[in-house]
């Protein structure tokens, strides 16, 4: 495999190599469960998302950590390093039963925390991401170049004109057109969790939905 297909960190995890395409899992851990398998966004304490990712990968459980390039310093000058774009966050594709079992019985998964939302009747519910929305989010968030940026979720509500991209490498992806700080973006927002944007999509490559 080519060198550019891997990233490393200068932290204590620098001895590990992680493939960029690890969210494309073929096999998932099989456990007895009658619950639906969903994409759960999980908070992870103390920037341990890559350690959790490594453990999930070893079990064959699909997961996704959004990554981007950031500048780091070295004795030879600054260089680009691929790092988590949103710290303390990992998306896990599993049933609630499997995730809870891992958290209860495997010490390495204790740092994971479910995220919740308030339902219409005021009750707390576990937050999960619909498959279609997660697929679109991963298609965009897995691209590491200057055309993709991650936004503060406080600046990126879902209010905006909902559209679908009709051509190009992101054909079929759905999102909203939103102006943020005088700039117009094509935005994919996971409420209260994450937001990724394409900085430019030609108007003739968009259709309303």
Where are these regions (language model features)?
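Generic structural signal for buried aliphatic residues
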Residues: 161-163
